């Protein structure tokens, strides 16, 4: 009986923590935060790639989904594994791109051109809310 309560408590704590980490963001605020990303990315439909790919339509798409962008082998490995840009994956990626790519590609030599990190949870939530509108 105690094990059942313990397991239920752990499950509830994990579910709560996951939900708290991905609270609903503000898309308008996220558009403002995305200005930090403009040196390397565009956000317009049909926009050009820069150092990084155009991010229009990235949400719920697979990793390395843009045919006109030269992704590294690490990103094509993530695509081959079926990685999709969900809220959780985007949040983990923008928080620490290098660590994310190392973990998800399975390649200990994995690299990412993206060195910029968003560290504030509210900015991450807001940028994700903005990316969700770009479809």
Swiss-Prot record:
Keyword Methyltransferase appears in the UniProt entry: no
PTM entry text: Binds 1 heme c group covalently per subunit.
Leader peptide range in chain numbering: 1-23
Keywords: Electron transport, Heme, Iron, Metal-binding, Photosynthesis, Signal, Transport
Biological function: Cytochrome c2 is found mainly in purple, non-sulfur, photosynthetic bacteria where it functions as the electron donor to the oxidized bacteriochlorophyll in the photophosphorylation pathway. However, it may also have a role in the respiratory chain and is found in some non-photosynthetic bacteria.
The family this protein is said to belong to: Belongs to the cytochrome c family.
The protein's name in its UniProt record: Cytochrome c2
Protein's organism: Rhodospirillum rubrum (strain ATCC 11170 / ATH 1.1.1 / DSM 467 / LMG 4362 / NCIMB 8255 / S1)
């Amino acid at each position: 009986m105690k094990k059942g309560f313990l397991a239920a408590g752990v499950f509830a704590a994990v579910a709560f923590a996951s939900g708290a980490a991905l609270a609903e963001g503000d898309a308008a605020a996220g558009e403002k935060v995305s200005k930090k990303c403009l040196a390397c990315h565009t956000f317009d439909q049909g926009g050009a790639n820069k150092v990084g790919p155009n991010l229009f339509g990235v949400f719920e798409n697979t990793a390395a989904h843009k045919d006109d962008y030269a992704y590294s082998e690490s990103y094509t490995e993530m695509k081959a594994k079926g990685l999709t840009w969900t809220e959780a994956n985007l949040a983990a990626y923008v928080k620490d791109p290098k660590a994310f790519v190392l973990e998800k590609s399975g390649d200990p030599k994995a690299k990412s051109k993206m060195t910029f990190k968003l560290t504030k949870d509210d900015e991450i939530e807001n940028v994700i809310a903005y990316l969700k509108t770009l479809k």
